[in-house]
Amino acid sequence: MEAVTDPALRQLLDSARSSESSRSRAGFGALQRHRTEDATLVGLLADLAECRAFVALTTITGTERRGTISRAGLFGIVLQKSQTDASLIRTAAIASVRSVSHLRLDGDGFPQASTSWPTFVSSHIELGEEISLMVSTQHVTGNVVSLNRSLLILDTPDGGLFYAVVDAIDEVSIRVPGSIRHD
């Protein structure tokens, strides 16, 4: 390839390269803006689950939960609080998410599960299992007696029964299988 020696031709080529570079940067910027415009909470939670990022979540009742999102679905997430404890948190109950590390996520990720909240909950708990749940600001602990798409029934430590509408449950705290309690 021969070097361009004509100053006018060199200036024309340099201008064309500069113009192409500017168009490329503008296109990338437009793509980033478009991806940001498409961001959703579910997409962000999916991105955070994929990164295994440590987060602090605040619920609509003002409760803060810390941990790693291990699974993100359309209607709920699994927040791993420790090796033995996890919380199922309804997506609609999440008010804010703060990542402890500085991550630049677009919030356009795809959820790992598209099941309903009742199906999501039932896939993580068993009859007889001791769980804790939050229904609005009410915290209740007990053993699971029954669970269907509408109601979760707990046998509470005081000998009573607690009936919760599954779609009203904001959070379910569970023990992780493989922990000492389940061995």
Residue ranges and their predicted role:
Residues 1-66, 70-141, 145-183:
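Short glycine-rich, low-complexity segments
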